[in-house]
Amino acid sequence: MGVPSFYRWLAEKYPLLVADVIEEEPVEIEGIKIPVDTSKPNPNNLEYDNLYLDMNGIIHPCFHPEDRPSPTTFEEVFQCMFDYIDRLFVMVRPRKLLYMAIDGVAPRAKMNQQRSRRFRSAKDASDAAAEEERLREEFEREGRRLPPKVDSQVFDSNVITPGTEFMGVLSIALQYYVHLRLNHDVGWKNIKVILSDANVPGEGEHKIMSYIRLQRNLPGFDPNTRHCLYGLDADLIMLGLATHEVHFSILREVVYTPGQQERCFLCGQMGHFASNCEGKPKKRAGESDEKGDGNDFVKKPYQFLHIWVLREYLELEMRIPNPPFEIDLERIVDDFIFICFFVGNDFLPHMPTLEIREGAINLLMAVYKKEFRSFDGYLTDGCKPNLKRVEQFIQAVGSFEDKIFQKRAMQHQRQAERVKRDKAGKATKRMDDEAPTVQPDLVPVARFSGSRLASAPTPSPFQSNDGRSAPHQKVRRLSPGSSVGAAIVDVENSLESDERENKEELKTKLKELIREKSDAFNSDTTEEDKVKLGQPGWRERYYEEKFSVVTPEEMERVRKDVVLKYTEGLCWVMHYYMEGVCSWQWFYPYHYAPFASDLKDLGEMDIKFELGTPFKPFNQLLGVFPAASSHALPERYRTLMTDPNSPIIDFYPTDFEVDMNGKRFSWQGIAKLPFIDERRLLEAVSEVEFTLTDEEKRRNSRMCDMLFIATSHRLAELVFSLDNHCRQLSARERVDFKVKIKPKLSDGMNGYLTPCSGETHPPVFRSPMEGMEDILTNQVICCIYRLPDAHEHITRPPPGVIFPKKTVDIGDLKPPPALWHEDNGRRPMHNNHGMHNNHGMHNNQGRQNPPGSVSGRHLGNAAHRLVSNSLQMGTDRYQTPTDVPAPGYGYNPPQYVPPIPYQHGGYMAPPGAQGYAQPAPYQNRGGYQPRGPSGRFPSEPYQSQSREGQHASRGGGYSGNHQNQHQQQQWHGQGGSEQNNPRGYNGQHHHQQGGDHDRRGRGRGSHHHHDQGGNPRHRY
């Protein structure tokens, strides 16, 4: 799933989802920086219990930080990470738990994608190095000095993979960081910290989800636990939905489209508005003010994405016209998660039919709502897709393929022609601009009353006729009384400044060249499109070109196998999101996906999985690394990747085909690498594994999560008693011994504790980094944490949950867009009412609202932000803060008129209505209400009104107060009619909306089956 594209689609379609983070900054007093006191209330009026960090979303940015120079050592990366975590902690301020999860060994299904990424990364790095060397030679010929290359420990980002030396040292550095904060930061004193490092199998975000799922519905669990998850992957949103935890937020950096980020319109720089612009030129990397520290970079802002608001949007957006039975929102949420897998995920190749940028999710949602009545039930039941219904759904989507491919081909042709015209125009302009010119001095001009004058910078040395004489010119400008030593220092400083400028110019040119080369439209030898989607015969040509089939019989055989494996993948992914890994060995064995219309006869498939075991870290490195990254492996393992006589040398091609597959940029292409043969790989490893040192064996082993708490924590007594009990046990006996956690001592956390292999409470904790202090009076203890015993994940909110007050109503929904393949950009006529759009929305003048336009409250909010940014965020001429409360609306909001059901399933504003409904004065639109003295949320009941064409909704639309017969749904997709039997609990439970709504439901037993070897077997 595209990282920015899905998040951007969601934030634009549902704007109330996101809220900007209010960030409190450290203050500096007499040169001493005073950190933020995180024990104080959160300025965002949101108090969170647990903060979860998907650490790979922190490690990768710290290899290439935007707020400081690029690091060259591991220690610089670690320091950047510490600052990064500190900043996130200040934003969220968890009160019970901080969970840091680093990616461990991934399931085999993910390793194919990891292999492709790492091979591409190595190839791109090689190409960039060659291009940089060419540019350096060009600069030297022109006499332009460059600083020498600096040796770097972090030259290869592929080392961010389990089993490498970097990941081993990182674990130690994070343990030190946790000890440092628990010992000295008052905001950390009462929290538990769990560190799941790279030696614990599983992707970071899925280790977090396993923790959340297995805490639910156990004794002592608080159903109103408030979760916040940080990470950069778009699938975190789906994972948050899949927990069915209501009080859940995703924290991430703001995603900008090019040109979208707010800049000062005077100087064009980010980080401030015109009202407080100082007219300073943009700083280059490495430059700083005389008294500055050189770290004056713009920090990216952050946003919360609230899952409970997304649930409210989905309840309204996914309403079914004239439903055949009462709709269960929890089942709708699960179906939404499932249908979004078709637009992309990390485990299956991209289906050629659907593109997010072409409105694919809108199409999937429209088809789902239109076809729902004919499904006779939901597409999924927990982690189990009903394949018969899935086939019916995806066939309806596939019926649009011809139109989609035809429009895509037409737009691709237009885009290619436009790029060629632009390219020709730029070439002409370059020829006109070849004559050398000298830029005149800029004249100081007053911007506005009370502002500073814009300084007129002197021309750079290379704005003169001969850049190489610049240093001598600067010597001649020295005053007669200046000393020779001062002149030498001045020249040296000038040379260093020139080198920095040249280095920045080289980096800029390098980025431009790499981007130009990655653009297929800039290539003189454009790859021929042999498939020609949209032209008759596209299906046959697709299988001939992508799967190398020749005869019709072979094509049909391959098509059936591709469909089977792809359907297995859909079932595997759904289980992974809802319950966890159902097979460590399964993977999709093709580079390409089938068409939507190819997914037939799904109900006849008998799909099974065997759990198996994860790879060892070094085995995964052999499976995903190119030979260029072999330096990160032990010596004998390297030879398996580089020796021409290696039995698996064919796994490591130095050159490989990248199929552009109709895409524009090379990074969008498909790397056609050979798939790893697990049997051959393990046989080769068995010949070298005995050569590992003790340290290498440790890096190659499977370990457990570590729990850290202060000695003052209520759980500390249990940890000390555990350590005393196990002192006389052998290492093997210590690993096997465990004691159950008492939830009342751990803020409701369940699980088991095991003594760690080292000291539980070392009196001194040495710093693994130069320049950082040792902890001489350590007051932190450590032990191993084990998850609670596996139990079924019940996919609905737990008993006793209190739903936040509603923040979204029908007026907050944007009109449903025209389907991409049907939208010709023209305004359609509708009967005799003048211009009318496709969404059932029109205004009194009969004119269509332009696509993407806003109105009503959204327009008012946008105008208010514009005024605030321009006038209220700076200081006046006397340096007096101008922040004032925002004015109220300057008009009386129009009376709200309920929308009328439109014949095509949407809603339209009735005659006389003016935009969207205005919120009631008491209505909170920022998420949680402030907590009262009792520590609970206000208990104001909410009940939505039943409307024609929309199901009645109380307490979020959860139905559980009725009972229906439910025919057992089979895993192979032959389920019978389903009349909304909500999956729930054995016995009764309560859902509370504002504290006074009761819900009841019935549960079923476990569906797990086991083979004779003890491994769970999952069957669809």
Curated annotation (Swiss-Prot):
Assigned keywords, A-Z: Coiled coil, Exonuclease, Hydrolase, Metal-binding, mRNA processing, Nuclease, Nucleus, rRNA processing, Zinc, Zinc-finger
Main location class: nucleus
Disulphide-bonded residues: none
EC number of this enzyme: 3.1.13.-
Pfam families in UniProt: XRN_M, XRN_N, zf-CCHC
Stretches annotated zinc finger (CCHC-type): 262-279
GO biological process: miRNA catabolic process; mRNA processing; negative regulation of post-transcriptional gene silencing; nuclear polyadenylation-dependent rRNA catabolic process; rRNA 5'-end processing
Ranges of Low complexity composition bias in the record: 831-844, 911-923, 960-972
Phenotypic effect of disruption: Embryonic lethality.
Cellular compartments annotated: Nucleus
InterPro entries: 5_3_exoribonuclease, Xrn1_helical, Xrn1_N, Xrn2/3/4, Znf_CCHC, Znf_CCHC_sf
PROSITE patterns hit by this protein: ZF_CCHC (PS50158)
Skewed-composition ranges (Basic and acidic residues): 121-144, 414-433
Annotated region (Disordered), positions in chain: 113-144, 411-440, 452-483, 831-859, 875-897, 911-1020
GO MF entries: 5'-3' RNA exonuclease activity; nucleic acid binding; zinc ion binding
Family that this chain belongs to: Belongs to the 5'-3' exonuclease family. XRN2/RAT1 subfamily.
Role summary: Possesses 5'->3' exoribonuclease activity. Acts as an endogenous post-transcriptional gene silencing (PTGS) suppressor. Degrades miRNA-derived loops, excised during miRNA maturation in the nucleus. Required for proper development. Involved in pre-rRNA processing. Involved with XRN2 in the 5'-end exonucleolytic processing of 5.8S and 25S rRNAs. Contributes with XRN2 to polyadenylation-dependent nuclear RNA surveillance. Involved in the degradation of aberrant polyadenylated pre-rRNA through 5'-end processing.
Protein name: 5'-3' exoribonuclease 3
Species of provenance: Arabidopsis thaliana (Mouse-ear cress)
Biological classification of the source: Eukaryota, Viridiplantae, Streptophyta, Embryophyta, Tracheophyta
